[in-house]
UniProtKB/Swiss-Prot annotation:
Active site per database record: S106 (phosphoserine intermediate)
Origin superkingdom: Bacteria
Catalytic reaction list: alpha-D-glucosamine 1-phosphate = D-glucosamine 6-phosphate
Protein name (record): Phosphoglucosamine mutase
Cofactor: Mg(2+)
Function in brief: Catalyzes the conversion of glucosamine-6-phosphate to glucosamine-1-phosphate.
Modified residues (Phosphoserine): S106
GO cellular component labels: cytosol
Length: 458
């Protein structure tokens, strides 16, 4: 197998520009065949696979290509249409399907697309299965093709959205409502554009919608979780109680309090961990966070007697750590929140409902709930790169890192890493003084840009 084929799967499935390698129709057909081949290899017999997508224009062709590959191998496919990624995980379990596939590039721009694969339990598939799929694609060996009378059928699940809406609402306490709450909601013109407003409205909230008119080419376009300034302004303008921003596939959430201040994944994790611990519902009194988690948040959790386990960045790594340590809550600063009591992957809508529940039960505003959390000054800069050359092979970059670490001493830290899903290098500096961390982060970002870059992303 070539080096390129081994890199087919990244940290969150396969992702790239639509109609360019690896995100081509041809590869999607082969992937469908390979998924079918792996299912037959592990358990011969009849199989069923769920297929969902977000609102990208290219989703139609990838949906058709995957279904063609799957059905050609005798697999029954259940097509859901636009639905959040956590909806695919849920429907896969609810229909007792053998696998689920989500066609999405998450927070990436519309011209990208991607493919995420879930097991029958609703978890993202393991590295072992990803490697086996890649082997089948590389060798074009998918096992025995069925006779013409045994090819699979394709069915459209017309009530998929409705089922997921009811599932999400069921994670909110029975008998309680959101009556009296005014919510500004930004769905990023993505997969949650119908589902999310329905969930909050059916629970009696007043919902003001942004990013709920997808065109196929406006997903994540200056809206959603990556651009919370939209709901920051809207919350103030509409005098709302809270703002909720989701990303393109609905598995990530950023919130805004009634004062227009951002409440990121770190703070959501803290709010929910504190609540679960008070109710003796936090497994082992521990949570899983990542290397990006703010030091001030870690100190706050420690003050509550909550152990924080640190994983690599990526919801897949967070989940793996949760399963290994039997934790039921984990999350990332970027807004991937995993509540294993409810779902098997990050779920923006369910996460929002848990925070809203805590607000109602405690009769608190969102700013009240975060008032005791003092975050350390932190700077994060994204640098677009032409290629991902190993950072430890770049002497100038390594020298800059040593200088910054020396400047920070024991009072701060620096993290430099490539994104697992985009050609981006992320610079994070944390310390005691805001002006210092901003300056040091800019220094590193400029050096990375000069060595590898295609420009700093504001």
């Amino acid at each position: 197998m070539t080096r390129e084929e081994k890199q087919l799967f990244g940290t969150d499935g396969i992702r790239g520009r639509a109609n360019y390698e690896p995100m081509t129709v041809e590869l999607s057909v082969l992937l469908g065949k390979a998924v079918a081949g792996v299912l037959q290899e592990r358990k011969p017999g009849k199989h069923r696979v769920v297929v969902g997508k977000d609102t990208r224009l290219s989703g139609y062709m990838f949906e058709n290509a995957l279904v063609a590959g799957l059905t050609s191998m005798g697999i029954e496919t259940l097509v859901l249409g636009p639905i959040p990624t956590p909806g695919v995980a849920f429907i896969t379990r609810a229909y007792r399907a053998d696998a689920g596939i989500m066609i999405s590039a998450s927070h990436n721009p519309y011209w990208d697309n991607g493919i995420k694969i879930f097991s029958s339990e609703g978890f993202k598939i393991s590295d072992v299965i990803e490697r086996r799929i890649e082997q089948m694609v590389a060798c074009r060996d998918f096992g025995n093709f069925p006779e013409d009378y045994a090819v699979g059928k394709n069915k459209r699940v017309v009530d998929a959205m409705g089922r997921y809406i009811e599932f999400a609402k069921a994670t909110f306490p029975k008998g309680r409502t959101l009556k009296g709450l005014k919510i500004v909601l930004d769905c990023a013109h993505g997969a949650a554009y119908k589902v999310a407003p329905s969930v909050f409205e059916e629970l009696d909230a007043e919902v003001i919608c942004y990013g709920c008119e997808p065109t196929g080419s406006n997903i994540n376009d200056n809206c959603g979780a990556l651009f919370p300034s939209v709901i920051q302004k809207a919350v103030i303008e509409h005098k709302a109680d809270v703002g909720i921003a989701l990303d393109g596939d609905g598995d990530r959430i950023i919130m805004v309090n009634e004062k227009g201040h951002i409440v990121d994944g770190d703070m959501i994790l803290s709010i929910c961990a504190s609540d679960l611990k008070k109710k003796a519902l936090l497994n082992g009194n521990r949570v899983v966070a990542t290397v990006m988690t703010n030091f001030g948040v870690l100190k706050y959790l420690e003050s509550l007697g909550i152990e924080t386990l640190i994983s690599s960045v990526g919801d897949r790594h967070v989940l793996q750590n949760m399963l290994e340590h039997e934790a039921n809550l984990g999350g990332e600063q970027s807004g991937h929140m995993i509540f294993l009591d409810y779902n098997t992957t990050g779920d923006g809508i369910v996460s929002a409902l848990q925070v809203l529940r805590i607000m109602i039960e405690s009769e608190s505003t969102l700013s009240d709930l975060t008032s005791l959390i003092v975050k350390s000054p932190q700077a994060l800069i994204n640098v677009s790169v032409k290629e991902k050359i190993p950072l430890d092979t770049l002497p100038i970059v390594q020298e800059a890192l040593r200088d910054v670490r020396s400047s920070l001493g024991d009072s701060g830290r620096v993290l430099l890493r490539y994104s697992g899903t985009e050609n981006i290098c992320r610079v994070m500096v944390e310390g005691l003084k805001k002006h210092q961390v901003d300056s040091l982060a800019k220094t590193i970002a400029d050096i990375v840009d000069s060595e590898l870059g295609a420009g700093i992303i504001e």
